[in-house]
């Protein structure tokens, strides 16, 4: 979804500098990439506004990762063959803005 003329104007005339910020969106849809997700449509609008204001934004779909369940930061140390959570948590820690999204 494209930004409206008013949204573009507000972004372009903003006196604030957000260029040093990083945003991470976790799209908690149940649909794997590249399947269309309505949640992604909502993310795209917010992400577009952030990027127009100089914020670096990334979107991850946890469903695309192999995340082991448990209470330890890396479940491969506790019997799991694979756990992508350490990759995701590093991105979460590096982000200034974390946006959790889910289907309505």
Range-by-range predicted roles:
Residues 1-104:
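N-terminal beta1-alpha1-beta2 submodule of the flavodoxin-like/Rossmannoid cofactor-binding fold
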């Amino acid at each position: 979804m494209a930004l409206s003329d008013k949204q573009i104007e507000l972004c372009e005339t903003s006196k604030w500098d957000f260029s040093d910020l990083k945003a991470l969106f976790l799209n908690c849809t149940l649909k794997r990439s590249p399947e269309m997700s309505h949640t992604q449509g909502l993310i795209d609008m917010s992400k577009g506004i952030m990027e127009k204001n100089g914020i670096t934004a990334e979107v991850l779909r946890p469903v695309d990762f192999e995340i082991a369940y448990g209470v330890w930061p890396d479940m491969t140390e506790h019997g799991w063959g694979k756990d992508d959570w350490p990759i995701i948590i590093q991105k979460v820690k590096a982000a200034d803005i974390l946006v959790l999204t889910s289907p309505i």
